[in-house]
């Protein structure tokens, strides 16, 4: 079973804790230079080893799917940004009691990746990658928490994240992918 959480990020996390969710996935897409092309998962500075391993697996699977690189931090966990990138993303997960990752599988500023994201087949593939990662790391099942990055914050209700090359916004496509992943997990 999957439940979507909204509100400010700390409220989402605390609500998922109260609901005893088994895991928490917040979906974003990255934006930077148009040539940027790596997949990554952010985990909080206080992340469990399960969060780190889940994030590493997800980032590697997303990179393989998209034919891109894996984020290579100066750590022992390829694909994982422990504590976020310069702290960005850490607060999005810091208050969870369960394993939690923030997904950044591609760059919406990269024209090729933005075009892929707009195609249903790529959305389906990203959703399957996320669903597969959850089934792999949480085989006993339970309530899964999904958070659509940027969307639904009470502190900034119009925030929809980065503009996508060629039109659209990050939160629109994060929501599409998460809804497709939820459908897969609830089968």
Where are these regions (language model features)?
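Active-site-proximal helix/loop segments of hydrolytic enzymes
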Residues: 1-187
């Amino acid at each position: 079973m999957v439940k979507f959480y909204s509100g400010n990020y700390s409220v989402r996390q605390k609500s998922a804790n109260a609901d005893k969710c088994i895991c928490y996935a917040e979906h974003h897409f990255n934006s930077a230079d148009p040539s940027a092309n790596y997949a990554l998962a952010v985990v909080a500075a206080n992340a469990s080893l399960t969060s780190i391993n889940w994030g590493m697996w997800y980032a590697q699977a997303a990179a393989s799917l998209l034919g891109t690189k894996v984020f290579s931090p100066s750590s022992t966990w390829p694909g994982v940004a422990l504590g976020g990138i310069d702290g960005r993303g850490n607060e999005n997960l810091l208050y969870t009691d369960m394993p939690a990752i923030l997904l950044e599988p591609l760059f919406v500023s990269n024209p090729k990746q933005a075009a892929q994201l707009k195609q249903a087949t790529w959305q389906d593939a990203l959703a399957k990658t996320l669903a597969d990662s959850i089934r792999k790391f949480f085989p006993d099942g339970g309530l899964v928490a999904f958070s659509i990055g940027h969307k639904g914050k009470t502190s900034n209700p119009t925030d929809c994240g980065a503009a996508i090359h060629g039109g659209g916004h990050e939160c629109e496509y994060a929501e599409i992918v998460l809804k497709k992943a939820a459908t897969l997990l609830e089968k």
